[in-house]
Amino acid sequence: MKILFLACLRAHTGNSTTALRIKDHLEAAGHTCVLKDAAILESSEVETLISQEKFNAGLIIQLYKAGRFLMGNRIPFGAIFGGTDINEDVKNEEKCRVMGAVLEEARFVVAFTHKIKELAATKWPHAKHKIHIQPQGILTKPSKSFDYEAFLQNAGIRHKSGHLHLYVLICGLRRVKDPLYLAEMFAKWHEKEPNVYLAIIGPMVDPVFTKEVENKLEEIDGVYLIKEIPQSDLQAVIKRSFALVNSSLSEGMSAAILEAMDLEVPVLARDIPGNSAIIKHEDTGLLFSTPQEFVQLSKRLMTEPELKRRIVSNAKRYVNSNHSWELERDTYQTLILNLQVNGNI
């Protein structure tokens, strides 16, 4: 099949990473898969694309932002829930209506978690039978040639050899990711313990908010903003870090958290539904509800080696069992067959 795949493709963000991985799964099964950025498309462009390029199937990530472009375009399509669908867009009446119409037309829908399926089935009961649960598959390949010391030096992070505790927070710079949530508390901690640093790594998604972040970080020490870097380099940074941090206001399923688990790096995450769906507190990671609690838990991680060992070991086992890249590949290669002309769910 020739598949038109629509997703919001901001570089080095979760959606982009997920889309590229699924595209690879489909092409491995012999399909032609053309990935387009839904963030910059117009409806008329999609109609022209479908007719000129002779696509016979479609796939989308995010029901509203991408799904609306395939409605009524006469090609069968499948859909994948994004975190924004359930956490944000569902609160808007018009967006919610469009999402319901997309679900009506979609041959199949994928949810990353049972919770997302439950929320969707409650909102759109007519689509319950179409929703398949497939957690994100994780495959990490950290760069072996990455120069970590040069990376730290370029970021302005000065440290004594062997004494650095680097925390990394990976996100596209937008308000929902709340990257400044821990900034002031972390700066106070850094003042007392100069070997702790927080690196916020990611692309400028919201220019206005990015400027706010830059201005804030100019006022404090110990917290650094670093532009996005290639995926393999980013994974090399995670692997050398003391812990990965997530402070988002809402999440679908954070690929960065799962990658850290796979790389055997402990995770400290804000206690929100998207994070607690994949982290069991003090078992596969640590969940915090306030900046003060984050520091308390971080200190425990530093002083209780058995806690760190248990979390890292259990998290690695969890990822291997529940986020298999091979199982994800099998799922999408099977589901996509529902888009053949006479395919049924």
Swiss-Prot record:
InterPro entries: Glyco_trans_1 (IPR001296), Glycosyltransferase_G1 (IPR052622). It comes from the Eukaryota. It comes from Xenopus tropicalis. Its EC number is 2.4.-.-. Glycans are attached at residues 246, 322. GO terms for cellular component: extracellular region. Coiled coil: none annotated. Transmembrane segments: none annotated. Residues 1-19 form the signal peptide. Belongs to the glycosyltransferase group 1 family. Glycosyltransferase 4 subfamily. CDD domains: GT4_PimA-like (cd03801). Keywords: Glycoprotein, Glycosyltransferase, Secreted, Signal, Transferase. GO terms for molecular function: glycosyltransferase activity. SUPFAM superfamilies: UDP-Glycosyltransferase/glycogen phosphorylase. This is Glycosyltransferase 1 domain-containing protein 1.
